[in-house]
Amino acid sequence: MAVGGGALIVDIRPEYQRRADGDIPGAIVIERNHLEWRLHPTSAGRIPEAIDARVRWVVICDEGYASSLAAATLRDIGLTAATDVVGGFRAWRAARLPIARRVKPTPPRLAPSRR
């Protein structure tokens, strides 16, 4: 998701949290343990958006703690425009910003018997 100034939102929450709480429409989903590998522009495993070190990454987690550490690590490896959402997804939700809810699958059930 591109936000003001062309920044891109990266959601590092685990799958179970995104499933339970919803997704941020347009956010790039990269779980925390893959973040540096996927965003560094010289990495063989980089995503297409990771074109150079000047990309403005906005990292979001659930409460803002993991994203603060992740953004600091990104800055440490040269991605100097990286930052995070203070308060994380909880603050995002409290601000009533867009959230995409997943449709829960209907569990299978037995068909009525025919006699």
Where are these regions (language model features)?
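Rhodanese-like catalytic fold shared by cysteine-dependent sulfurtransferases
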Residues: 1-8, 12-56, 65-115
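Short, surface-exposed ligand- or partner-binding patches at beta-edge/loop junctions that are enriched
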Residues: 60
